[in-house]
A protein has these predicted regions:
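Beta1/beta-strand and adjacent pyrophosphate-binding region of the FAD-binding site
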Residues: 2-17, 41
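Short, well-ordered alpha-helices that flank and scaffold nucleotide-derived cofactor binding pockets
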Residues: 23, 27, 31, 164, ...
Length: 229
């Protein structure tokens, strides 16, 4: 693949943030008749899913206390479900099995799930919880359980394979992915602080916009961009 000299969008990071952005942006450009993924380049200093995206737990759930997070995760679950094969996603559901001290908080999570129409079941009481679990696991023996929140949707994904699947979807829309390419700095407009290019160890890519999806490496880019501490 020839090294690109100019594109509209440079995305830094080939993990879930960068590749998801590339895929959705390419799809949006195509839908609006403004081009396709050929306007987008993703660069990464290492390889696809080489960072946190490749080693996270892989759990897909909607079990969060913040209402805004719950609505966001409901949409995310829909994305996972949209192409389970390529995302290496297993829709086995998710369960929170809790002692009495957590029951009221879990009950609130359940109530908010119901408010947004998220498919889940909430079992309360020691005996009912035990019976519910034994219907699925005949050898269930855990003690001190007073509630079970069973999310019928959700599950888990095989991390690295899922990210490669995401890369395939982005590339299918024309996105170019350059791995083993390290960002060394940025170019700025002569009359403004706008970024006009991304400097790498393989050359400079002129661009209109830069999206940094580098996860825990964001600090180094923050410094390169001379943003306030």
């Amino acid at each position: 693949m020839a090294f690109p000299e100019k594109v509209d969008y440079v995305i830094v990071g080939a993990g879930i943030h960068g590749l998801s952005t590339a895929w959705h942006l390419a799809a949006k450009l195509k839908a609006k008749g403004k081009g396709d993924g050929s306007k987008i380049v993703v660069i990464d200093k290492d390889s696809i899913a080489a960072g946190a995206s490749g080693i996270a737990c892989g759990v897909v759930r909607n079990n969060y206390y913040q209402p805004a997070m719950r609505e966001l995760m409901a949409m995310c679950v829909e994305v996972w479900e949209s192409d389970a094969k390529n995302f290496h996603y297993h829709d086995v559901g998710y369960m929170q099995i809790s002692p009495e001290c957590m029951e009221s908080d879990v009950a609130e999570i359940y109530a908010q799930q119901k408010n947004i129409g998220y498919d889940s079941v909430f079992i309360q009481g020691k005996k009912d919880s035990e019976n519910y679990m034994k219907k699925m696991f005949g050898d269930w023996q855990a003690q001190g359980i007073t509630s079970v929140l069973h999310e019928k949707r959700g599950g888990y994904a095989n991390n690295t394979s899922a990210i490669y699947g995401l890369a395939d979807k982005a590339e299918a829309l024309g996105v170019k992915i350059l791995t083993g390419t390290t960002v060394t700095g940025f170019e700025f407009g002569s009359n403004s602080n706008a970024v006009t290019g991304v400097q790498t160890d393989k050359g400079t890519i002129k661009c209109e916009q830069v999206i940094v999806g580098a996860g825990p490496w964001i600090k180094s880019f923050w410094d390169m961009l001379e943003l306030p501490n």
